[in-house]
Each structure stands twice: as structure tokens, then as C-alpha cells.
A protein has these predicted regions:
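C-terminal helix-to-coil terminal segments
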Residues: 1, 85, 92-105, 261-337
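N-terminal glycine-/charge-rich "phosphate-binding" loop or analogous flexible N-terminal tail
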Residues: 1-45
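Short beta->alpha connector loops at strand-helix junctions that form conserved
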Residues: 28-29, 51, 72-73, 89-100, ...
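Rossmann-like adenosine-cofactor binding region
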Residues: 57-60, 173-270
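Phosphate-binding beta-alpha-beta segment of Rossmann-like dinucleotide-binding domains, i.e.
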Residues: 87, 95-144, 159, 163, ...
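Glycine-rich Rossmann-fold phosphate-binding loop(s) that bind the pyrophosphate
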Residues: 150-151
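N-terminal Rossmann-fold NAD(P) dinucleotide-binding loop
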Residues: 154-155
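Positively charged N-terminal leader segments that act as targeting/secretion signals
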Residues: 328-341, 345-354, 359, 363-367, ...
Length: 388
């Protein structure tokens, strides 16, 4: 049997049980670098399931038996994927297990902030029934929601917001206006255009060098003074020091944050002193239903990968190998390369950038496109996600 390492606290029992049925399983007591290296090498581990643990280049370099890392969820910023690729380790993730739960959390934030829910609850608990006379909340109908990053989560948020009669805009330079219009979404041609118009701004991006700190002082000054910022992506996408100043100085009205730059936050984190911020502990996607689905898919993905079968989803750097294998066969190249042409691939960094076609093509045209792109990937070494 294949040998798999789980890390305390691990995934849901539905996933653990599936792995135990198919693999010899070991448990690491924590996710510290030295602990993982020791456990992997002592037990000749081939596959590992990760959640929030930091998986470093040193781990990949020090553990020659490790072949697969299966991330429980979509985000892989805790894993040095480039190092994994360098050492022949495939990284797997689950991009569609919890997107509905995250979208629901976005709408909860919109409603809670618009109706001053937390303040109203506090007032009633402390005998201030007259809060209803001194506080006038806002409706969300006819308000404008800007979605920054129109991936699975963003598209699901758009559907939910439309049901509340909100005006939905999106900033995503890789999706044309006509495609957005088909979803009932108005395209913001620039981020600034969207920020100027929005009453609520929700960030749905992966953390990359390009997105780190993209919401900062300049962006907050562009936003309406009545606007609310929502972040359910990754904490460092938002410059927290700049956000604190914007909120303290009433440059924007509020924020709702499921993620922070440092988790958990330090006791002296300035944002914690403000009453116009709603916090949740990075569990926007952690509904019971989503956790069950993600745990099961993570286990299935890992088992298939260890058995040499086609896997549910690879992180994009590792798809280079798959594309390269398809270079000699046009249709195989198309099958391997095109899923990430219009799925999550957003930018290519190898000294130059290029926009990738998202439009589905068929037949020989698709095969040619796939083969051409596969050959291009063979010559370039780093492809990364931008949007969720």
C-alpha cells in the first residue's frame, strides 16, 4: 500500500476513512517543518494531505520519497509549488469544493454590514432598545456590488447578489464584457472605475506577487465614503495598515474580513480596536457540507495520484509536465492543455506576459490550439493562478 501522512488537526473523517481503506496511514502531531521532515523520512511517505501548514522548499529537498501533496481546499499559497515542481512533487488542490459556502459568506457580510447587525445585537443585549431610533440601516437593493475576480466564487456571488436586486459589477481583465453581460454583470474596465461606483467591494483573488497589497491607500481614497470592503480571499491582498487608516479616518464606511495578513491576529492588531469592522476566523468556506465534500475529494484525488491515474486537479505549475507529454500528439496536447486555457490560468511569467484565450474551440482548431500552447509551455517554466 502507498504510505500517506496526515497532520493533526486533519481533514474530516469521510476523507480520513477513505485514505485508510486504500493506504497505509501515519499521523504527524503538528505541521512544523522539522516534524514533517522527520515523519516523512522515518515512514517513507509518498503522499501527504495539507490544510494550513507551510510546506517549504526544505521539506521537498529533504524528503526524496515524497511524490504527492494534496491540499485540502483551493488555496496553495502555503505550499512552495515551484519547489515542489523542481523536486518532481505534484501538488493537488480542490478548486470547487466550497465556493458556494464562500459566496454565502460574502452575502452574509453584505447584509450584516448594511443592517448594522452586530451593533444591533449588542444594543439589545445591553438594554438599548432605542437603538432602532438612533440607527438607520441601509437596504442592499439597488446598491452596487463590485466583484474583483470573477472565478467560481465571484460568479456565484453575482447570482446571489442579483437575487437581492443588487447592481453587480466585476473587474476581471480576462473576461470580456459580452461574457459578463450574459451573466447579468457590468464589466468595470479598470479597477478604479469599479471602486468609484461600488457600495460594496468583495475581493476574490489568489495571493500572488501581483495581487499582494493591491488594495491600499490609493484604492481606499477612490472608494465612496459610504463603501464597505469585503475580503474573503487572502489577507495580504489588502494592506491592513492602510485599511486601518482609511476606516479610522472614515474614508470608507466599513470592512468585513474573513482573512488577515497574520492569522490569528496579534492581540494588538489595530483593526481589532475599530467598531466598523466585522471579523470571522477564516472559515468562510467551512460549512459542514463543504468540509465533507472537500475532504472526500481530497482523499479521492490523492489516491488516484498515488495509483498513477488521472487526478481531479493539479496546481498549474505541475500541468507543464502533462502538456509536455502531449506535445507529440495534437489531440492529447489539446486535452491536456486547454482546460487551463479557460479555467484558472491567468498569467504567464517567463520574462513576458500574455493573455490566454478563454473561448472554447472545437475539433481541429482546438487540437491545434492545445498542441501549440503545450509546445509553448514546454519552453516556459512558471504558470500561476490569479483568480479564484
Amino acid at each position: 500500500k502507498h504510505r500517506v501522512l496526515l497532520i493533526e488537526p486533519t481533514i474530516q473523517p469521510v476523507g480520513v476513512d477513505l485514505i485508510k481503506e486504500n493506504c497505509e496511514t501515519f499521523m504527524a502531531p503538528d505541521g512544523k517543518e522539522e516534524t514533517l521532515i522527520r515523519c516523512i523520512n522515518e515512514n517513507q511517505i509518498e503522499g501527504m494531505v495539507t490544510r494550513v501548514e507551510t510546506i517549504t522548499r526544505k521539506i521537498f529537498k529533504s524528503c526524496p520519497t515524497l511524490k504527492i501533496v494534496a491540499q485540502h481546499g483551493v488555496g496553495v499559497d502555503n505550499i512552495d509549488v515551484a519547489a515542489a515542481t523542481d523536486h518532481g512533487v505534484k501538488v493537488l488542490n480542490i478548486p470547487d469544493g466550497n465556493y458556494t459556502s464562500v459566496a454565502e459568506h460574502v452575502m452574509m457580510f453584505v447584509l450584516a454590514s448594511s443592517r448594522t447587525l452586530l451593533q444591533a445585537d449588542y444594543a439589545v443585549r445591553h438594554g438599548n432598545w432605542k437603538f432602532r431610533e438612533t440607527n438607520i440601516p441601509h437596504a442592499v437593493a439597488e446598491k452596487t456590488l463590485l466583484i474583483v475576480g470573477l472565478g467560481r466564487i465571484g460568479r456565484t456571488v453575482a447570482k446571489m447578489a442579483a437575487a437581492f436586486d443588487m447592481n453587480v459589477m466585476a473587474y476581471d481583465p480576462f473576461i470580456p464584457a459580452n461574457k459578463m453581460a450574459e451573466l447579468g454583470i457590468k464589466k468595470a474596465e479598470t479597477l478604479d472605475d469599479g471602486l468609484k461606483a461600488a457600495d460594496y467591494v468583495t475581493i476574490q483573488l489568489h495571493l500572488t506577487p501581483e495581487t499582494r497589497g493591491m488594495m491600499s491607500t490609493e484604492q481606499f481614497k477612490i472608494m465612496k465614503k459610504s463603501a464597505v470592503l469585503l475580503n474573503l480571499s487572502r489577507g495580504p491582498v489588502v494592506d491592513q495598515a492602510a485599511l486601518y487608516e482609511a476606516l479610522k479616518n472614515h474614508e470608507i464606511a466599513g470592512a468585513a474580513l474573513d482573512v488577515l495578513a497574520s492569522e490569528p491576529p496579534a492581540a494588538d492588531e489595530p483593526l481589532l480596536t475599530l467598531d466598523n469592522v466585522i471579523f470571522t476566523p477564516h472559515f468562510g468556506g467551512d460549512t459542514y457540507e463543504a468540509k465533507q465534500t472537500v475532504s472526500r475529494k481530497t482523499a479521492e484525488n490523492l489516491i488516484k495520484a498515488l495509483d498513477g491515474e488521472d487526478t481531479y486537479n493539479w496546481v498549474i505549475e505541475n500541468k507543464i509536465e502533462a502538456a509536455e507529454k502531449g506535445c507529440g500528439d495534437k489531440r492529447k496536447g489539446a486535452a491536456q492543455a486547454t482546460p487551463f486555457l479557460y479555467e484558472k490560468a491567468r498569467s504567464l511569467r517567463a520574462g513576458k506576459r500574455c493573455f490566454l484565450a478563454r473561448r472554447r474551440q472545437k475539433g481541429r482548431g482546438l487540437a491545434a490550439l492545445g498542441a501549440h500552447f503545450a509546445q509553448f509551455i514546454c519552453k516556459n517554466t512558471l504558470l500561476h493562478f490569479l483568480l479564484i
